[in-house]
Amino acid sequence: MSQYITNPRQQSRQLRRNSPSGQEPHFATSSVPLNQRNSILDPHLSVLQLLDRADPPSELSSLKHGEIAKPATPRRSGFESVNCSISESWQSIKHTDCSMVNTQGDATHQHAGILSSSDTSEDEPDAQLSPSPNNFAFPNSATSIFPEAPHNLEASSLREYQNSEIANPREENDNETVTMSLMNSSNSFVMPKLSLIQQSQKFCILIVGKPAQRFYRDIPRAYHKMFEVRDVGHLSPREMNKYSAVMVIFGEPKEGKELLEKVAAHNSNIIAVCQRGQQQQISNILNRYSKSNEIRLVYHLTVMSDHQDVHRLLRYLNTLSTEVDSGYETEVGSRKIRKRRKSSKKRSPQITVNRWVIWSISLTVGVGLGYCISCLLSSTSSTLSVTLRSGDEVTIMEDIHNSPHESPFDNYLRHLLLAVKRAVKQVNSSFKQYLSGQSLPVLWMQRIGKEWLSEASDPTLPGVTALDLVLV
């Protein structure tokens, strides 16, 4: 196994001694036995032999390398010379060689550009916008910023350039524009320079008034982020104008009027909250200011002790803040003012007329049914025997009772029915008098009925006819 792990230098010396001419033998020749060529470095030696057999350098590269003076290197033999040539080869590459290769490859490279709607030709080359890696150049960083090397610049001009950058580090001009050209064949457009100095206004409501702290403590903590409690005397007009709205908590009507005047001068979006019993006075003050367009009510007047109304107010403000933060509404109070829903609704005149008609019809039907029932009951209690002796004479016979012997219960029932019948007749007569005095059509119908009934000889017809008139 020792012959397979021999040192490469010893192996090369042994081969040099065995060679008759004293020249360096090739490592991959067939004259060397197989057991002598098998070693760990055989694959690497084959690669080195291929590098030695490379083509001779071209004229262009020989001229380029001839201009650069190389230090004299001692001649080495075997593996040392090969390793040194490989290690020194990458150091001999200069930036000029890379740029020369790129300039030579530009002629044969097919350019690919970005097409736009204003392009007239698709084959126009554009080397700056081409995404190909072969088009990538290696410019010097100093020459890309300055027109000449930094050490060639004068000290005064460099100092002026640095001072100008230090003097205006964050100066921005909104009127400044940037002109960009997409391609050589495309039209240029003007892009305005955006400014991020002004930040978007955050939805926040200022609470003022003596009971402001108590109101702020009573509301849930989830709504605290929307409010801020401060004193009006310590606020400048600019700070008060930053708030989306101002919630005025009225303690006393006299002090509330002065407080409302201070707030309305700088912020017109008002949310009014008063104490119980002050609704009429505070509403008069608010109406006076709203008619003169000095304030704008975001929500209707709310009582501080009414927890349900306060909860509805907080929910409304929460939804309003969500819409403002999301950008759906740009101004607080753009909605219409929410008005309190009244529990008592005004009755329309149509409903009133319909109710009177229904009541009159129901009373008429009830009286008519009662009269019919009383007539039927009276006819069953007694029967009349009528005999006609001649066409001009009518005789009424004696009443023939159904049963000769009456029980006390039947007698009591008959008296009760008679009493009900009399009561119904009295009610009917009084109702007729009321209707005759109230409505002219009923009076006219009664007059017609009397004239028509006066000609009739049967005494039972007037009652039936009067019932028909009432039903009509």
Curated annotation (Swiss-Prot):
GO terms for biological process: autophagy. Residues 1-35, 58-80, 113-139 are annotated as: Disordered. It is found in: Mitochondrion outer membrane; Vacuole membrane; Preautophagosomal structure membrane. The chain crosses the membrane at residues 356-372. Keywords: Autophagy, Membrane, Mitochondrion, Mitochondrion outer membrane, Transmembrane, Transmembrane helix, Vacuole. The keyword Transmembrane helix applies. It is a single-pass membrane protein. Residues 58-68 have a biased composition (Basic and acidic residues). Coiled coil: none annotated. Residues 129-139 have a biased composition (Polar residues). GO terms for cellular component: mitochondrial outer membrane; phagophore assembly site membrane; vacuolar membrane. Belongs to the ATG32 family. Mitophagy-specific receptor that recruits the autophagic machinery to mitochondria and regulates selective degradation of mitochondria. Mitophagy contributes to regulate mitochondrial quantity and quality by eliminating the mitochondria to a basal level to fulfill cellular energy requirements and preventing excess ROS production. Recruits ATG11 to the surface of mitochondria. Also promotes autophagy-dependent peroxisome degradation. This is Autophagy-related protein 32. It comes from Lachancea thermotolerans (strain ATCC 56472 / CBS 6340 / NRRL Y-8284) (Yeast). The gene is ATG32.
